[in-house]
Amino acid sequence: MVYTDTVKLLQECDAGTKMAVTTIDEVLEKVRDTEMKELLQESKDHHEKLGNEIHSLLNSHGTEEKDPTLMAKGMSWMKTNMKMGMDASDATVADLITDGCNMGIKSLNKYLNQYKEADHKSKDISTKLISIEEKLCKDLSKYL
């Protein structure tokens, strides 16, 4: 059970990092404020670095990476484009990214509780990813 929970938790973290990177990429070029753009780029870099670590661990377990579901990606894309179409401001970007972070934090905590038998390393990665999301939410709050 430890192996199964470990792999499943890592796969959920993998999907989460990919979703974060994709979402940040969708809005980054639309951000006007230089500091906000730097915050988003820094967070994207953290997500990519952690994603690479997750990929290595999944490979060492002989399992495949996990992409976000098509439904999640499609809904995110629609919401982003609809909101940005109505108001392409930095406040809208901050709102969208904050919503995404909150969904990520909620999901990751759910998976930490669900995959209790996961190994220490995968739990640490989940916790690190939650911290990255929480920091980004806090940093973006001044743009809301």
Regions found by a protein language model. Give the residues of each.
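Amphipathic alpha-helical hairpins
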Residues: M1-L144
